[in-house]
Structure formats: structure tokens, C-alpha cells
Amino acid sequence: MADTTGRIPLWIIGTVTGILVIGLIGIFFYGSYSGLGSSL
């Protein structure tokens, strides 16, 4: 556990990556849903 890559722990990188992926998917679905709703 002591050998961290550089200065950033691996769990922080995983957490940030997961949040970014979930955020992008949420924005994509929200954009498509609101786009379909506004077109009707």
C-alpha cells in the first residue's frame, strides 16, 4: 500500500474517473431526453 504511483493514490484516480464517467453518461442521457422533450 506504500507504493503509490507518483503523489496521487490509486483510489483517488479511480474515484475521480468513476465520477467523470457517470457525469458524462448522465449529461448525455439528460441532453437527449430534454432534446426529445423540447422537440415535441
Swiss-Prot record:
Q: What GO cellular-component annotations does this UniProt entry give? A: chloroplast thylakoid membrane; photosystem II reaction center
Disulfide-bonded cysteines: none
Matching InterPro entries: PSII_PsbJ (IPR002682), PSII_PsbJ_sf (IPR037267)
Q: How does it sit in the membrane?
A: Single-pass membrane protein
Transmembrane regions: 8-28
Q: What does this protein do?
A: One of the components of the core complex of photosystem II (PSII). PSII is a light-driven water:plastoquinone oxidoreductase that uses light energy to abstract electrons from H(2)O, generating O(2) and a proton gradient subsequently used for ATP formation. It consists of a core antenna complex that captures photons, and an electron transfer chain that converts photonic excitation into a charge separation.
Family the UniProt entry places it in? Belongs to the PsbJ family.
Specify the protein name: Photosystem II reaction center protein J
Lineage, highest ranks first: Eukaryota, Viridiplantae, Streptophyta, Embryophyta, Tracheophyta
